[in-house]
Design a protein with these regions (language model features):
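A short, compositionally biased domain-edge/stem linker segment
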Residues: 6-19
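Short aromatic-enriched loop/helix-cap "lid" or pocket-rim segments at secondary-structure transitions
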Residues: 42, 130-136, 193-199
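Hydrophobic/aromatic beta-strand patches that form the interior of the parallel beta-sheet core
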Residues: 29, 61, 119-121, 183-186, ...
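C-terminal catalytic-base region of ester-bond hydrolases, centering on the histidine
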Residues: 177-283
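Serine-dependent carboxylesterase/thioesterase catalytic core
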Residues: 76-175
């Protein structure tokens, strides 16, 4: 599966989204993943991307979704944010993990907003739900633990049930209609690449269903429109070599292609990373 995606990039050039006629500044808007407030250490809060964007003189903001909100609740927050931001900025939306589910529902509600995006970058996006949710909901002996966890974080059961596998099909249907470039960055790990015991456990549970990153089934990427950049040996949080924030920063610099606005962007970028195939080979 990795070879399939990597080979598709071999002759694809990286197109620029920069429009000289559009004077609006660039804004990187981050849709965070689940538990981003409770467990910021996993990277789902986008903090590192915000810090790196500041170094590149880009505006970068985290959309204040609910850490354990349902996709519908968070979709409304995303659309409210975009309605305002798009009036003043060219927006690149970066969705992290479950943030992709939230953004997919947001697009289904307001496709007109997403057609105005400069680009959409999904990092380890959960686009079709996750078998994690099925496991937690269907195992009777886990129900008390799940209930306690939800109570502790002030969330309801719908926050988990809405993430059942195949429950987020809106993502595929909606993104088929977008005119904005969509890029999916996804880790392709083997068991030996996973340093976290919990990640190895989930990886083993899901492997009978096919290749996975310990959260999502990687064959689901075949359903999504846009460009898939596979990262060999990286887990769901893209921990391998350069981290997710560095990869996304490099990608945004290539997509924007506006060296006149900020020469340091390309001065700090490896010039060999100007095609999709070279990007995936190096990360």
């Amino acid at each position: 599966l990795y070879v399939h995606f990597a080979s598709r990039l071999s002759h694809c050039a990286v197109g620029s989204i920069h429009d000289a006629a559009d004077a609006r500044p660039l804004l990187v808007a981050v849709v965070p993943g689940a538990f981003y407030r409770e467990h910021p250490e996993v990277g789902a809060d986008g903090r590192e991307l915000i810090e790196l964007s500041a170094q590149q003189a880009w505006d970068c903001e985290r959309i204040p979704t609910e850490s354990l909100g349902t996709p519908l609740t968070n979709a409304k927050i995303i659309n409210s944010y975009l309605s305002s931001a798009l009036q003043r900025h060219r927006v690149i939306l970066v969705s992290l993990s479950k943030g992709t589910t939230d953004a997919g529902v947001a697009q289904a509600l307001r496709p007109d907003l997403f057609q105005k995006l400069a680009a959409w970058v999904s990092v380890s996006g959960v686009g079709c739900g996750t078998l994690m949710a099925d496991w937690l909901l269907d195992k009777w002996y886990l129900r008390p633990i799940l209930g306690l966890m939800l109570w502790r974080h002030g969330a309801d059961r719908q926050a988990v049930s809405s993430m059942r596998y195949n429950s987020a099909q809106t993502f595929k249907a909606a993104t088929d209609e977008t005119q904005s470039p969509i890029v999916h960055i996804a880790g392709f790990p083997l068991q030996k690449h996973l340093s976290c015991r919990r990640a190895r456990l989930w990886h083993r549970r899901f492997r009978t269903h096919g290749p996975n990153d310990s959260v999502v089934l990687l064959q689901d990427l075949l359903k999504f429109p846009g460009t898939v950049i596979p990262v060999w040996g990286a887990d769901h949080y893209l921990r391998a070599g350069r981290n997710a924030a560095e990869r996304v920063t490099q990608l945004i610099a290539m997509l924007d292609g506006n060296s006149e606005q900020n020469p340091d962007i390309h001065a700090n970028s490896d010039p060999s990373l100007r095609t999709w195939s070279q990007f995936t080979a190096r990360v």
